[in-house]
Amino acid sequence: MKRGIFDLKEPKTILVVEAHPDDAALFAGGTIALLAEDGHTIVNLCSTYGEKGTLDSSKTLEEMIETEKRESQNAADVLGTKEVIYLDVPDGELAAGVVLREHYTEIVRRVQPEIVLSFDPAIPYDPHPDHQAVGRTLYEACYTSHFPLYYPNQQTRGLKPHLVNWYYGWTSSTPNTFIDISTTLEKKIRAVEQYESQMQMMLQESMNRLDQSGFNIPTLNQLEWKAFVRLWVTRTAQQIGRHKKIPYAEAFHKIGYGVLDILPQLQEI
């Protein structure tokens, strides 16, 4: 153990849950790399393949699925992720509710994580319904996973109830945990670069929106996609860390379940 990220003093299992294959690298890649370097076991769940993330109408869903799977495995190798699991729900069709909660509860019971990383359950102003569905439903599943009468059929398949204590939500409007990723920034950039299909799409979409809105940013016009990735990742990490005087950071909202949510008050008794 090196740094004790998230106050972990010994190797643990960390579950990272994405809506789409590039989410974790973009929002938490530096932190995931730190955790892997510290000896923790990282398991990554892709809720969808992100197969609709293209502006090229000549592409098929099957082609995009194969591309996204390859890119996600490559990114996992860069970050040090041990296992990548695919939930196999169609892109854009994740629906918050009982069905998705049962899927997530099953994964939590199978993986038995100490900590879960994903979207903030109270994610604000995110236009993608998949992001909202993942954050809210996974947060609920981490609570129900230790109650045996929730989805008891899972126990007949050897999946025991499991207690999750801490949930760390990225893309939060109220972050309370900031991780210095200065030593893993380059690794995060390399991981994001593995998603060539998505980064090229993101750059093209950005240019289309600027052009349609009448804005002209010469520097952006001249960027090739890898330079765009480096600029986006670096500037975002700098902006997050600025108020905490951290050169490059990622931010999360740390949520404790049950009594852990009032731990500071209890420690004052």
Name each model feature, range by range:
Residues 1-11, 147-160, 171-269:
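C-terminal accessory domains and tails appended to enzymatic cores
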Residues 1-111, 262-265:
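Active-site rim/loop-helix segments in enzyme catalytic domains that contact anionic ligands
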Residues 16, 46, 86-88, 118, ...:
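Structural signal for conserved beta-strand scaffold positions within catalytic alpha/beta enzyme cores
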Residues 20, 128-131, 195:
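Histidine-centered active-site/metal-ligand motif
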Residues 34, 38, 140-145, 194:
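Active-site catalytic microenvironments for nucleophilic, acid-base chemistry
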Residues 43, 73-167:
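Internal alpha/beta domain cores that form substrate/cofactor-binding pockets in large enzymes
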Residues 54-58, 129-131, 179-181:
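Short aromatic-enriched loop/helix-cap "lid" or pocket-rim segments at secondary-structure transitions
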